[in-house]
Design a protein with these regions (language model features):
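Extended, non-catalytic substrate-recognition/exosite surfaces adjacent to catalytic cores, especially
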Residues: 1-194
Length: 194
């Protein structure tokens, strides 16, 4: 098989990074749930599907200060902190505008006790990595997370090609004697019939 594990991991990481960057530009959408506002919070948290390859954890906010928040990782005996300086993407001025005690959020470990806030993207994507010389598929990723969506955007999506089709048209023109600087008449054409 031409698939390469290193390429596959690099493609998955690149796709996730791009999707997360785009999603962050859309801003923060709110915590998953608040334990003080929803009596059924434990069942809702237990039903959350999270891809283990993301290396995320589910955390509860235990203390909110202006520029520092303390968290407790659920189902583990771990506590940590989130620093506000890493959350400029949220569009908020401080933690008091962002989170409250009892909020349940996704986090990812940065260092020993420092964590960063995460959110599941609303957008998705796919990526196909091919060797341009022989056409072999080197890596194929069908989405951000198989757990959150089993639809494979790389093989199952029926997308219009858009500008991706231009090289095929240009190649056909070059094969038929056109040059890159050839002038093409772009005026309406009328043909009289009889």
């Amino acid at each position: 098989t031409p698939l390469n594990g290193k390429y596959q991991i690099a493609a998955l990481n690149a796709l996730r990074s791009g999707i997360e960057s785009y999603d962050k530009r859309q801003g923060w959408r709110d915590p998953i749930i608040n334990v003080y506002k929803d009596k059924d919070w434990q069942n809702k948290v237990n039903n959350l599907k999270i891809d283990k390859t993301l290396n995320w954890e589910i955390a509860k906010i235990i203390r909110v200060e202006k520029y520092l928040t303390e968290i407790k990782i659920l189902n583990k005996n771990l506590k940590g902190k989130i620093l506000f300086e890493s959350l400029k993407w949220t569009g908020k001025k401080n933690f008091n505008e962002l989170l409250s005690d009892g909020d349940i959020i996704f986090v990812q470990k940065k260092s020993s006790d420092i964590w960063t806030l995460k959110q599941l993207p609303k957008v998705n994507g796919g990526i196909v990595v091919m060797d341009p010389f022989n056409g072999k598929v080197k890596a194929l990723v069908g989405g951000y997370s198989f757990i959150s969506s089993e639809f494979n955007r790389a093989t199952q999506a029926k997308r219009q090609p858009g500008s991706a089709f231009k090289p095929i048209v240009y190649a056909a023109a070059l094969e038929n004697g056109f040059l890159p600087n050839s002038l093409i008449l772009d005026a309406p054409f009328v043909s009289k019939q009889g």
